[in-house]
């Protein structure tokens, strides 16, 4: 099997990772592997897919492959805020209806994540702080 030698450049400027304790090095996958599912990439989408497969197919073997560190790329460089209000609500009836749909969807997404944190007993300092929007 060929070894991959060309990987995306990592400029090591992820500020969030810089404030975390050093993570243990995970050994490279070796030998022949057998899995029902292989997820490539451990960013938001890959982690969500692997987690969901584990929930929906608990007897299946899932392998998650990441070239670098989990959540270290673009997924780990966001601000991590979840807000339920759009930045610009608008003033027309159509814009207000769209904003209400957005608010319902956003609140459902926040609730989904809150439930996942509680169910997984994830220690992440989850806190509802509201939103301040000042001029």
Predicted feature locations:
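Short, flexible active-site-proximal loops enriched in glycine and acidic residues
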Residues: 71-79, 120-125
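Glycine-rich Rossmann-fold phosphate-binding loop(s) that bind the pyrophosphate
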Residues: 37, 41-47, 67
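Glycine-rich FAD pyrophosphate-binding loop
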Residues: 54-77
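Extreme N-terminal leader/targeting segments of oxidoreductases
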Residues: 1-37, 55-61
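Dinucleotide-binding Rossmann-like beta1-alpha1 core, especially the glycine-rich loop
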Residues: 83-135
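Short coil-to-beta-strand
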Residues: 36, 75-90
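A structure-centric signal for secondary-structure junctions around beta-strands
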Residues: 34, 59, 76, 128-129
């Amino acid at each position: 099997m060929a070894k991959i030698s060309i990987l995306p450049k990592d400029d090591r400027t992820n500020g969030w990772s810089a404030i975390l304790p050093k993570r243990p090095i995970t050994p490279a996958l070796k030998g022949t592997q057998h899995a029902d599912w292989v997820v490539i990439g451990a960013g938001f989408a890959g982690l969500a897919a692997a987690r969901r497969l584990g929930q929906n197919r608990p007897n299946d073997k899932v392998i998650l492959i990441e070239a670098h560190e989990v959540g270290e790329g673009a997924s780990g460089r966001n601000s991590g805020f979840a807000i339920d209000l759009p930045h610009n609500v608008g003033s027309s009836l159509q814009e207000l209806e769209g904003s209400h749909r957005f608010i319902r969807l956003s609140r459902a997404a926040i609730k989904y994540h809150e439930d996942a944190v509680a169910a997984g007993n994830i220690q992440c300092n989850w806190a509802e702080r509201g939103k301040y929007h000042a001029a």
